[in-house]
Amino acid sequence: MVSDATVQKLADMFTDSVRNTCQGEVAILFSGGIDSTAIATVARQFTAPLLITAGVEGSSDLEAAKRTAAELNLPHKSVVLTEAEIISVYKKCYKIRRGNLLKVELMVPVFKCCREAARSGKWRILSGSGAE
């Protein structure tokens, strides 16, 4: 069993890590899942992060992220991807990360969210991706 002290130390380390990244304006690659929601919840103690989600029109993921962002009372932008955009960005990402098609596929929404963050003047980006 994990002690309360260990849980508190982990929570403190997590908070410190997010605080150290939240110098100035930040964006969070936001799915509305537990990892990105935890980051957003802590980040809002130090800044007003912009939550950004990418997906296709009508996606339940976009809707879930939008609802969770509203519950957190944080600004949220949805990046709606068309089939043509997905193919175009996939080709760009493939040039960056040849060979591992799954990683290239996962890069597409990240690429589009990072572009949106840059357009919004956010140069620090947090992500819960891979937290597990």
Q: Which residue stretches match the model-derived regions?
A:
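ATP-dependent adenylate-handling active sites, centered on carboxylate activation for C-N bond formation
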Residues: 2-132
